[in-house]
Amino acid sequence: FLRRAHVIAARRIALLDAAEAQSGAGHVPLETLVRHFLTPALEMAQQGEGGRAFVRIHSQLRGEAGDLGLALRRQAFGASTERYVSALCAACPHLSAEAVYWRFNFMVGSYLVVSSQAGRLEDYSGGACAASNMQAALDQLVPFAIAGFLAAPPAANAAPIAPTALANAKVPGRTRV
């Protein structure tokens, strides 16, 4: 895991370094940040069975609570995550750092779902989409993530989630116990 993760992290940092050098004193454009962050991981998913196995392991580590998975991910991606979050904060001054972290987390989760190629996309799209097409995934994921970062922050007085609404929902074929 770490060997491939370090390749992704190093490529992300190299892309960010180049983008920062090109932008000079200004901040790196949001689209550039998102594309540069996502591309190395989606490229890895195309590197044969080893790349696909890495993505599955990464998805598993991300989905499991526990110190080992967190420590491995922090060791592999900690420096690149800090750099990208900092750059995203500069590119999204309308968001708090907390909001950027949340949206960054959603972006990471999205690319892991897409790159795991578990067959679900093909299933619910009726074969119209192929999760193995990483270029199509990137072309769809970049504007999706950008829209998330550009969205207004949530209202401070937003209504909380009502757990009873879901618990009381009528589900066909389900009997209350």
Show where each model-derived region lies.
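HTH DNA-binding helix-turn interface
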Residues: 1-7
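Hydrophobic alpha-helical connector segments
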Residues: 7, 11-51, 104
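Short linear capping/connector segments at secondary-structure termini
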Residues: 18-22, 58-60, 123-128
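Amphipathic alpha-helical packing segments from all-alpha helical-bundle domains
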Residues: 28, 32-35, 66-92
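Residue-level detector of well-ordered alpha-helical segments, enriched
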Residues: 29, 33, 37, 50-57, ...
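Amphipathic alpha-helical segments used for helix-helix packing
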Residues: 32, 49-75, 119-123
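Short alpha-helical scaffolding segments that buttress acidic/His motifs in well-ordered protein cores
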Residues: 37, 41, 55-62, 107, ...
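C-terminal peripheral helix-coil segments that are non-catalytic and often amphipathic
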Residues: 78-177
